[in-house]
């Protein structure tokens, strides 16, 4: 997902068609080979024998869903091709269904499909790689605006509210979540073009 995002943004900034092609090829590959029955899978191993398809397995984690949905949204914003928006929405719906913590807001790192876990952690720390929770929150906010989805907005708002004190006390630990808070606090602009 992060690669899709990087290439889509690179295309927007530099107008390099090869970046767009790379983003679309990667997104198409993941959606065709790493989604089974609506579930995103974490790994893919191609086989040497060209007669057989590769193997995808292991249920994806929160980071995988959030980053892939975010990459698809960046690709949608670069192309305005609705299939990317629809795919991002599909992943976000599944992410909410499988990872959302109904009691305390936020997303667990693992879904119910992950077996034999002692605990289900809920990491928020944004290090060199943004946390799944911060990216998921940003994805929900973006989709809430693009799709006019109040449910996504309410869940994102619940995450930001629950983390308000932590973000205030240690802002450098939650940089991507602060980006989501910035998106939440500042209104978006909608432009209608008729003609």
Question: Where do the model's predicted regions map?
Answer:
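Glycan-recognition and catalytic cores of secretory/periplasmic carbohydrate-active enzymes
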Residues: 1-195
């Amino acid at each position: 997902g992060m690669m899709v995002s990087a290439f889509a943004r690179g295309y927007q900034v530099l107008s390099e068609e090869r970046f767009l092609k790379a983003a679309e090829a990667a997104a198409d590959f993941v959606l065709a080979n790493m989604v089974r029955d609506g579930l995103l899978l974490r790994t893919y191993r191609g086989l040497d024998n060209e007669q057989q398809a590769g193997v995808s397995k292991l249920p994806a984690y929160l980071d995988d869903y959030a980053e892939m949905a975010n990459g698809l949204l960046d690709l949608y914003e670069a192309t305005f091709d609705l299939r990317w928006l629809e795919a991002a929405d599909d992943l976000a719906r599944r992410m909410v269904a499988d990872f959302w913590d109904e009691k305390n807001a936020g997303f667990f790192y693992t879904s119910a499909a992950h077996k034999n876990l002692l605990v289900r952690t809920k990491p928020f720390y944004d290090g060199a790689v943004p946390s799944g929770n911060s990216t998921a929150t940003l994805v929900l906010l973006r989709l809430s605006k693009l799709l006019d989805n109040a449910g996504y907005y309410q869940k994102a708002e619940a995450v930001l509210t629950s983390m308000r004190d932590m973000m205030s006390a240690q802002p450098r630990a939650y940089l991507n979540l602060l980006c989501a808070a910035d998106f939440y606090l500042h209104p978006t602009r909608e432009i209608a073009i008729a003609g």
